[in-house]
């Protein structure tokens, strides 16, 4: 087994332990906790593959990090921090759109993972645009702050927001929630578009028709919805 592979795992285990202490002291935000959860799963898998005990690896990782820090100069640390990537905050919505209260005539609420989806089922035959405010790192969506669905008249008819009780979410959580919101709005013959900014950083591309590519799971779900609606329409006739 390559020694660098082992030492990398040991250091990762110790750094995860340090980050866990930050969360335990309630000093970490939602993206921090999200990465912590994902890295925990990754470390368990790597430990199993390498045949290494995580607790023992953490202790050795601590020794490696302490040795490096003892040799690290303040100037080198400043240069490392300066070159580290920083997340950006992107805004589709204005402050007014972000903070505006809205009401639903026929409310429907669904929890999809760590995200809450709200839809006004009374809205029919409208052109709707999905806008979002979110942070980006490495040109990918990092954390969703808030997503809202707007009619051409500016009315809010849907929303996706993180659940305070379940902090942390992945980009896949966001895309799945958007698929559910689109399906719910299209049920009532609304035409839904997604902002180019959100398409670019969530899916890595933007389509002129404003529709992001759906996952196979979302396609199957929407197909079942369409078949169910067709059967209901036939029964009504």
Swiss-Prot record:
Record organism: Influenza A virus (strain A/Hong Kong/1/1968 H3N2)
Region CPSF4-binding, residue ranges: 180-215
Keywords: Eukaryotic host gene expression shutoff by virus, Host cytoplasm, Host gene expression shutoff by virus, Host mRNA suppression by virus, Host nucleus, Host-virus interaction, Inhibition of host innate immune response by virus, Inhibition of host interferon signaling pathway by virus, Inhibition of host PKR by virus, Inhibition of host pre-mRNA processing by virus, Inhibition of host RIG-I by virus, Inhibition of host RLR pathway by virus, Interferon antiviral system evasion, RNA-binding, Ubl conjugation, Viral immunoevasion
Extent of motif Nuclear localization signal: 34-38
Post-translational modification summary for this protein: Upon interferon induction, ISGylated via host HERC5; this results in the impairment of NS1 interaction with RNA targets due to its inability to form homodimers and to interact with host EIF2AK2/PKR.
GO molecular function terms noted in the UniProt entry: protein serine/threonine kinase inhibitor activity; RNA binding
Name of the protein this chain belongs to: Non-structural protein 1
Biased composition (Basic residues): 217-237
Chain intervals for the UniProt region annotation (PABPN1-binding): 223-230
Domain commentary: The dsRNA-binding region is required for suppression of RNA silencing.
UniProt function note: Inhibits post-transcriptional processing of cellular pre-mRNA, by binding and inhibiting two cellular proteins that are required for the 3'-end processing of cellular pre-mRNAs: the 30 kDa cleavage and polyadenylation specificity factor/CPSF4 and the poly(A)-binding protein 2/PABPN1. In turn, unprocessed 3' end pre-mRNAs accumulate in the host nucleus and are no longer exported to the cytoplasm. Cellular protein synthesis is thereby shut off very early after virus infection.
Subcellular location: Host nucleus; Host cytoplasm
GO terms of biological process kind: symbiont-mediated suppression of host cytoplasmic pattern recognition receptor signaling pathway via inhibition of RIG-I activity; symbiont-mediated suppression of host gene expression; symbiont-mediated suppression of host mRNA processing; symbiont-mediated suppression of host PKR/eIFalpha signaling; symbiont-mediated suppression of host type I interferon-mediated signaling pathway
Similarity section: Belongs to the influenza A viruses NS1 family.
Region (Disordered): 205-237
Entry GO terms, CC: host cell cytoplasm; host cell nucleus
Primary subcellular site in the record, as a coarse category: host cell
Entry-linked SUPFAM superfamilies: Ns1 effector domain-like, S15/NS1 RNA-binding domain
Entry superkingdom: Viruses
Span list, region RNA-binding and homodimerization: 1-73
Positions occupied by motif Nuclear export signal: 137-146
Gene name tied to this protein: NS
């Amino acid at each position: 087994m390559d020694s660098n592979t082992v030492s990398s795992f040991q250091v990762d285990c110790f750094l995860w332990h340090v980050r866990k202490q930050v969360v335990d002291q309630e000093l970490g935000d939602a993206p921090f906790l999200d990465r912590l959860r994902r890295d925990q799963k990754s470390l368990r898998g790597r430990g199993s593959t390498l045949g290494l005990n995580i607790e023992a690896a953490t202790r050795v990782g601590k020794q490696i990090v302490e040795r490096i820090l003892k040799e690290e100069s303040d100037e080198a640390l400043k240069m490392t921090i300066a070159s580290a990537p920083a997340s950006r905050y992107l805004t589709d919505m204005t402050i007014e759109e972000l903070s505006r209260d809205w009401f639903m005539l026929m409310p429907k609420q669904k929890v999809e993972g760590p995200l809450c989806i709200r839809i006004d089922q009374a809205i029919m035959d409208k052109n709707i645009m999905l806008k979002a405010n979110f942070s980006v790192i490495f040109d990918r969506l990092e954390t969703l702050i808030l997503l809202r669905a707007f009619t051409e008249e500016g009315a809010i008819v849907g929303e996706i927001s993180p659940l305070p009780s379940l902090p942390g979410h992945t980009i896949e959580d966001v895309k799945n929630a958007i698929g559910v919101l689109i399906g719910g709005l299209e049920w009532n013959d609304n035409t839904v578009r997604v902002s180019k900014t959100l398409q670019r950083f969530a899916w890595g591309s933007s389509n002129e028709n404003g529709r992001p590519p759906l996952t196979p799971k979302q396609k199957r779900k929407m197909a079942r919805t369409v078949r169910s609606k067709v059967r209901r329409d036939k029964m009504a006739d």
